[in-house]
């Protein structure tokens, strides 16, 4: 956490080719002259840093307290959610911070074939962001790619809700009856 907080002052832009929340926010804050009010964006950056850290902390506490079945699919979807959510809401992120979410997206596609559009969408947005560097091209659809990742996060939250929180967990009885003692 400390390296992230010290690097916040080193960078001026709220995002560096990463398809995150600031692609969307920066588009909203354009003025009529085409200039961006950087002071407002920096304040938003600090606010979203607190929001991102707080939301992640609350979600981690909720996951810790919620009794849900621990299996490979649940672990993959939960890890994928956090690997995608954290660089999406934190400011000053480069596109390379989405690499972990790309890895979990591949695992998610194989674990949930019917929901593979979520993983494909995030990998596409990440690839579009990464592809600008070797070809020295401008990432022209930053807003749209940010919206694609936002939609993927919402869909992934729906998968988590369905798979983890709405699924009935088997109830263990408080005490097991001894054989034959119940009938006597």
Give the positions of each predicted feature.
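Transmembrane helical bundles and short interhelical boundary loops of multi-pass, membrane-embedded
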Residues: 1-14, 22, 58-61, 79, ...
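Generic hydrophobic alpha-helical segments
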Residues: 28, 107-108, 131
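Membrane-embedded alpha-helical segments of multi-pass membrane proteins
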Residues: 50-52, 97-105, 143-151
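Alpha-helical transmembrane segments in multipass membrane proteins, preferentially the mid-helix core
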Residues: 58-62, 99-111
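Short, contiguous acidic/charged loop-to-helix segments that flank catalytic cores in large enzymes
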Residues: 87-95, 109-112
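Membrane-interface catalytic loops of GT-C/OST-like multi-pass glycosylation enzymes that act
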Residues: 90-101, 134-141
């Amino acid at each position: 956490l400390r390296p992230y907080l010290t690097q916040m002052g080193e960078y001026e832009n709220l995002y560096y080719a990463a398809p995150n929340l600031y692609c969307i926010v920066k588009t909203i804050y354009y003025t009529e002259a085409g200039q961006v009010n950087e002071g407002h964006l920096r304040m938003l950056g600090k606010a979203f840093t607190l929001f991102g850290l707080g939301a992640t902390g609350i979600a981690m506490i909720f996951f810790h307290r919620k009794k849900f079945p621990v299996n490979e699919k649940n672990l993959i979807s939960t890890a994928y959610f956090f690997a995608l959510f954290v660089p999406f809401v934190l400011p000053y992120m480069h596109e390379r911070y989405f690499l972990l979410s790309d890895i979990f997206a591949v695992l998610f596609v194989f674990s949930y074939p019917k929901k593979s559009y979520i993983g494909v969408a995030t990998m596409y947005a990440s690839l579009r962001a990464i592809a600008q560097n070797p070809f020295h091209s401008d990432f022209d659809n930053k807003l749209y790619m940010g919206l694609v990742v936002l939609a993927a996060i919402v869909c992934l939250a729906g998968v988590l809700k369905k798979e983890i929180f709405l699924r009935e967990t088997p109830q263990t009885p408080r005490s097991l009856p001894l054989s034959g003692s119940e009938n006597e």
